[in-house]
Amino acid sequence: MVKPRIIETDEGIQGEFDVQTYNSMMRSLRDRGWMETGHIIRSGIAHGLALEIGPGPGYLGLEWLKKTESTMLLAVEISPEMTKIAERNAREYGLEGRVKYVKGDAHQIPFDDNTFDGVFTNGSLHEWSQPIRVFDEVYRVLKPGAKCFISDMRRDMNPLVRRFMKLMVKPKEIRPGFISSMNASYTIDEIRSILNQSNLKESIVAKTFMGFEITGMKSE
């Protein structure tokens, strides 16, 4: 039986210790090749100007820039401390000229309608207090015909997978936050119901090993 969802903060990761610890975890995932970059590119987001929601320390978007040509990235992050880490990491990649991090909230994306050739985000959906509103914001800022890719954990993952993931999370100081995120994540049925109430209702939801991927497109 799947336990009820436990709501998590929508303020992102704040505080120097938590930010640095999360950066270490994401760098480790990057080094293991566990980024969702290939999935994003295969979904059709591989050119022009893209938006990343909740980039955290920035590795996903930076890997996307590294693996695509003549692309640019704008990223909206609610945590000022995390933005500083992402900017530092962009300099390490030598990609600071192709990415800009903006302090902002996904519930009110600070960009005009029909701006982006693609929108992607990983691991932030469970933090959104009003996911329907964010889905509608994603739809609004996409250009007609442009695509979005949204991935996250799911609360109804196999218990053995859940246990494995908890053990794999390092450094161990991040494990309580990881468990909190798992408990705040949605089931497949829940996320389909939410999408059906948004402008992204035509999106496809696919189950993955430990989560799900949403792929959608703004109508022409």
Q: Language-model features: where?
A:
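A short glycine-rich, Lys/Arg-flanked "PGG" loop and its adjoining helix->strand segment in the class I
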Residues: I132-P144
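C-terminal alpha-helical "lid/dimerization" subdomain adjacent to the S-adenosyl-L-methionine
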Residues: S151-I214
